[in-house]
Amino acid sequence: MCAALRRNLLLRSLWVVLAIGTAQVQAASPRWEPQIAVLCEAGQIYQPQYLSEEGRWVTDLSKKTTGPTCLRDKMDLLDYCKKAYPNRDITNIVESSHYQKIGGWCRQGALNAAKCKGSHRWIKPFRCLGPFQSDALLVPEGCLFDHIHNASRCWPFVRWNQTGAAACQERGMQMRSFAMLLPCGISVFSGVEFVCCPKHFKTDEIHVKKTDLPVMPAAQINSANDELVMNDEDDSNDSNYSKDANEDDLDDEDDLMGDDEEDDMVADEAATAGGSPNTGSSGDSNSGSLDDINAEYDSGEEGDNYEEDGAGSESEAEVEASWDQSGGAKVVSLKSDSSSPSSAPVAPAPEKAPVKSESVTSTPQLSASAAAFVAANSGNSGTGAGAPPSTAQPTSDPYFTHFDPHYEHQSYKVSQKRLEESHREKVTRVMKDWSDLEEKYQDMRLADPKAAQSFKQRMTARFQTSVQALEEEGNAEKHQLAAMHQQRVLAHINQRKREAMTCYTQALTEQPPNAHHVEKCLQKLLRALHKDRAHALAHYRHLLNSGGPGGLEAAASERPRTLERLIDIDRAVNQSMTMLKRYPELSAKIAQLMNDYILALRSKDDIPGSSLGMSEEAEAGILDKYRVEIERKVAEKERLRLAEKQRKEQRAAEREKLREEKLRLEAKKVDDMLKSQVAEQQSQPTQSSTQSQAQQQQQEKSLPGKELGPDAALVTAANPNLETTKSEKDLSDTEYGEATVSSTKVQTVLPTVDDDAVQRAVEDVAAAVAHQEAEPQVQHFMTHDLGHRESSFSLRREFAQHAHAAKEGRNVYFTLSFAGIALMAAVFVGVAVAKWRTSRSPHAQGFIEVDQNVTTHHPIVREEKIVPNMQINGYENPTYKYFEVKE
């Protein structure tokens, strides 16, 4: 009976084995269920397909999509599910766990679906779920059923797949099948249920054809041409319409609160980092776990920030397939988040199927921690002797798993700050590693310079690579964050438009029509359309402001799409007013009021009055006005930049000129100093020779005075003017002789020469010269001016002695000063020590030590000796305090 039951279980679980598309896990349910499939290929746009109740994939060309590109956004996928299955209550979607081969793809614009004969593709479809849908999992004999539920975790399909695989791996088992638990958002859930089986569980091996296709490749969503279907009442199954006037007023106040903050949102859009156009993978990083960052971030709906156009889907797991050299089996290393909830660690699971056809069994993928655990504790792994390589990656930011449209703006801002801090920490780690390598290089250079130089080259190359990788990673993360924010803002705007249109159409069809309800719903629709318009204009202005000529080029390429989007919004406004005109009574009451309301909304955009009209020319004029303003700002910035550059060059030239002038003055000063030194050196020999001549003359003049004796000296002293008279007489004789010689020379020129006169003149001159040389000269300060102006030898000796005495006096002064200061310091220190000791004594504190031996007649015990010391420190007997309190 047990064998029959086992066979029955194996037959019932055959559909599970057939769904092994990725060699990891099986699907949960083979029965028919609503599903849609989307094919996204570069350069090709295909219509999505849905699974009919007959089990065939069908393309319905009448069901329009929300954009010109393939469906990537979760909200768009959910909307298409609702369109494909209008009779079902579709509230959520989830990615299928296996691939299906689907053909008959129709390109966008095809007119007949029967003629579409596109080649078959392996696609992973999306399941359209109801309010709550739990899959039944088969539990074969020897396997275990378990589930993980954490209300604080709102994770996508892939993340819970990893969590279940890790939980099975901890038990030494492998995950056989799994299913999602309670949903907490669009395509995000708060738990997983799974079945774990032994690693060597016997099951039939099946050859499965697998193709490596991404589920949702990262790309920008061009939402510029979001189409508002005005007359399709099947777009949504909920309505904000209420027949209660109070509820309408509350909804209206909420929308007005959002619109009042719209200017702040648009202004903040320019200051927000738009990210880099790079959409490549962000590379490896080592940030902390998601468990460390688990806060709820709040922000109002009015804080929707209009960022740059283009949005990316949620962070998906990117896998790398590689061949294990030891065993030849294929292993997978993840470039995705790896986090562990409180119940179990997370192990990666594949998102892409391998390319080659091969016989596979259900072997779970291993994360870095799980692989290390298996390598250490189990030696018979199915993938070979060694653990598969895995790349450690940071956990995803909570922003990607927590979404509330009312708090989207604040969550985005907090996530931006968190991303900047994480990037700053990574840069700090890289710089620290660089410092360590630099120290190592300095040590190596002392031992082996050649090896050190080679090491430095490798080190520099690796550092440059690391810095570049960090920059690319940071740009990719910023772009991913901005793209997700853009996606959520656009989805929220579209949701508001759909809800407002549903409310408006229901209010118009109400019998009898309620003018107040129609007015409120139409105002809500007009505000939603205006918000979409403000978003388009803000994005266009952001492109203009994003980077000078490059931003202008990007805005020029985006202008046609922006203009078309504005025209579509104007067309929707006109259609809504046309719908109102079909009801003359309502139109007569509120038509003029609604027209004024439209103009009031348009006036909030800082648009000239001539451009408020809803026409293509007016919209083009608005875009041209923005472009002209930005071009004027760019030209002004360029002019200011050139002027600043010229000022800097002028200041640099002035500084250079001042520097040259300073150098010239310094050179001139040095030249003057050198010239003065040379002049002093040349004057020193002249002065010494002059002094020696003066000394010789003084000695010669002193000799005649000594020969005359004391009598002559007395005569000279008695008649001091005698020498002066003689010198004047000698000077007159000399002048007379010179005059005679000169007259004689003049007479020689005459034709007649008197020889006798010449002879007499010569004799007179010779006699005068002989008489002048024989007569001694008197020492006089006018005669020897140079000798009297120079210092004598005795004065120089006296100056040297005076300088030596002054130097000795200064030394004595310094010694006495130092001794006095030291003595004063010693006195102060002694006084301070004495005061400190005095203050520490009990007598100074008002206590008097009592001799216990004198006052008492009984011997003193040890405790009683301690009591006085305790009382000094403030001790009070508790017995006394007790009686005092009692009294």
Curated annotation (Swiss-Prot):
The NPTY motif mediates the interaction with clathrin. The clathrin-binding site is essential for its association with X11-alpha, -beta, and -gamma. The sequence specific recognition extends to peptide residues that are C-terminal to the NPXY motif. This interaction appears to be independent of phosphorylation. This is Amyloid-beta-like protein. The chain crosses the membrane at residues 814-834. Residues 28-813 are extracellular. Interacts (via the intracellular domain, ICD) with APP-BP1. It comes from the Eukaryota. Residues 1-27 form the signal peptide. Residues 246-267, 293-321 have a biased composition (Acidic residues). It is found in: Membrane. Residues 30-133 are annotated as: GFLD subdomain. Keywords: Amyloid, Developmental protein, Differentiation, Disulfide bond, Glycoprotein, Membrane, Neurogenesis, Signal, Transmembrane, Transmembrane helix. Residues 268-292, 329-352, 681-699 have a biased composition (Low complexity). Belongs to the APP family. During development, plays a role in the regulation of the neddylation pathway. Appl and APP-BP1 interact antagonistically during development. Glycans are attached at residues 150, 161, 237, 240, 574. GO terms for molecular function: heparin binding; transition metal ion binding. A motif (YENPXY motif) lies at residues 875-880. GO terms for cellular component: axon; extracellular region; neuron projection; neuronal cell body; plasma membrane. GO terms for biological process: axonogenesis; central nervous system development; learning or memory; long-term memory; mushroom body development; neuron projection morphogenesis; peripheral nervous system development; response to axon injury. The gene is Appl. Residues 225-365, 377-396, 675-743 are annotated as: Disordered. Residues 30-199 form the E1 domain.
